[in-house]
Design a protein with these regions (language model features):
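Conserved N-terminal beta1-alpha1 strand-loop-helix module at the mouth
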Residues: 1-76, 80, 129, 179
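Hydrophobic faces of well-ordered beta-strands that scaffold small-molecule active sites
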Residues: 4-7, 31-33, 62-66, 86-88, ...
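Generic structural signal for well-ordered alpha-helices
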Residues: 20-21, 48-52, 75, 97-100, ...
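Glycine-enriched alpha-helix->loop->beta-strand junction motifs that scaffold or abut catalytic
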Residues: 27-28, 58-59, 80-86, 104-109, ...
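Alpha-helix-loop-beta-strand connector modules within alpha/beta enzyme cores
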Residues: 48-63, 108, 152-165
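Catalytic cores of alpha/beta
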Residues: 73-77, 118-123, 177-190
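Conserved anion-binding
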Residues: 85-154, 161, 166-168
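Single conserved hydrophobic/aromatic residue that forms the stacking wall/gate
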Residues: 194-202
Length: 202
């Protein structure tokens, strides 16, 4: 079953609490919170205190996507802030297994994200310890980019490997999602899409 997780990158940052409540009311399954530090990616967004402040505005899961250097250092802060899923990049400078285990020990779901140039096989050693894998279909750091359909073989490869092992693994795609690109993502094996929060209350 396909799930939808709106990204905060297209929110009105002056009304984020209202935006979160609206997205839940409109039927969002999760909320995708992009955390950027200006180092791992060139843009800069928000940190754990803002995530904590937003937690009361929605009851659906918060998927916090750490596009930051040294995510291991900041995992405890985001766990305390109310992150239900913590996604960090396999390309970051933190030890992958240690970071996964810290997230698991804190009671949240660990997830790994791959930049477009990173092959699917990079996450295979960790699949048994993950709740999900995020495949970037744009270069991370900015909204409004075009969907990279050539990432779909990567999604399909991860789905095949997860199915071969009998894993109940969520696979998400992030970037350039629209009505035109959903079908390609679903066909490749993605089950969760990160989108811009465009729907409005009826």
């Amino acid at each position: 079953m396909m799930k939808i997780s709106p990204s905060i990158l297209s929110c009105d940052f002056s009304r984020m609490g209202e935006e979160f409540a609206r997205m839940e009311k409109c039927g969002a399954d999760w909320l995708h919170i992009d955390v950027m530090d200006g180092h791992f990616v060139p843009n800069l967004t928000l940190g754990a205190p803002i995530v904590k402040a937003l937690r009361p505005y929605a009851s659906i899961p918060f998927d916090v996507h750490l596009m930051i250097s040294n995510p291991l250092q900041y995992v405890p802060d985001f766990l305390k802030a109310g992150a239900d899923i913590l996604t960090f990049h396999i390309e970051s400078d933190s030890p992958v297994e240690e970071t996964i285990e810290l997230v698991r020990a804190g009671g949240s779901v660990p997830a790994l994200s791959l930049k477009p140039k990173t092959p699917a096989e990079a996450v295979f050693p960790y699949l048994d310890r993950l709740g999900m894998v995020l495949v970037m279909t744009v270069e991370p750091g900015f909204g409004g980019q075009s969907f990279m359909e050539d990432m779909m073989p990567k999604v399909a490869a991860i789905r095949r490997e997860a199915d071969r092992r009998g894993l109940n693994l969520d696979i998400q795609v992030d970037g350039g999602i629209s009505e035109k690109t959903i079908a390609a993502a679903a066909k490749a094996g993605a089950c969760l899409l990160y989108t811009s929060p465009s729907p409005r209350d009826p």
